[in-house]
């Protein structure tokens, strides 16, 4: 399973309510007529993207929230289909309404590394319930193979999933652990700061689900 993740925030002068409604309309459109290979989509409000969506001082002064989209896909072929379908017949109007209100944005592509799936291929831990994301990144030149296998230590696959970046499409971190927790103190041992090598970082972001379907 792959996940295309997109971080974005409103263009200067665009109200958050109007922006959210436009984004929700696009997600509803995809759910109504789902492209082949697209399993689920999710939209979250986040306080800030820790790898920085560069915005003007005016936008920052608005204290406008940032947003995080997840598009769960079967494979790379499904990613290509979504890319075409999003601006194709049936979705073009909703896509363009959302896009024209958007300001800064950045994307990343991740593959499921650890996490249970049902017989139908769905995640056992629903993406929409993951209200905490822990982003783990390494310094340039550092090896990650062995550590990547340990990040899931202590993770309950029924309530969490571990994702690993596939392509460098932007500033997104190397790994993402999604957990259904209300407190960062309950984070799995594998991503505890005391276990990470020097230079590695673990950034915790709280998320509020606006859409999952």
What is the predicted role of each segment?
Residues 1-213:
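Macromolecular interaction modules
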């Amino acid at each position: 399973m792959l996940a295309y993740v997109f971080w974005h925030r409103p263009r200067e002068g665009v109200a958050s309510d109007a922006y959210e409604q436009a984004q929700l309309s696009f997600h509803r459109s995809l759910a109504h007529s789902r492209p082949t290979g697209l399993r689920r989509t999710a939209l979250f409000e986040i306080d800030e993207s820790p790898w920085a969506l560069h915005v003007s001082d005016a936008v920052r002064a608005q204290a406008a929230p940032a947003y995080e989209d997840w598009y769960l896909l079967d494979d790379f072929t499904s990613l290509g289909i979504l890319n075409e379908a999003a601006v194709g017949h049936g979705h073009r109007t909703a896509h363009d309404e959302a896009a024209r209100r958007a300001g800064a944005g950045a994307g990343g592509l991740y593959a499921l590394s650890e996490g249970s799936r049902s017989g139908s291929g769905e995640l056992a831990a629903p993406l929409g319930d993951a209200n905490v994301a822990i982003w783990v990144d390494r310094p340039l030149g550092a090896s990650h193979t062995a550590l990547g296998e340990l990040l899931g230590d202590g993770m309950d696959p029924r309530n969490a999933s571990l994702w690993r970046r596939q392509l460098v499409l932007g500033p997104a971190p190397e790994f993402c652990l999604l957990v259904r927790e209300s407190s960062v103190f309950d984070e799995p041992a594998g991503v505890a700061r005391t276990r990470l090598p020097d230079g590695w970082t673990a950034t915790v972001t709280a998320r509020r689900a606006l859409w999952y379907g």
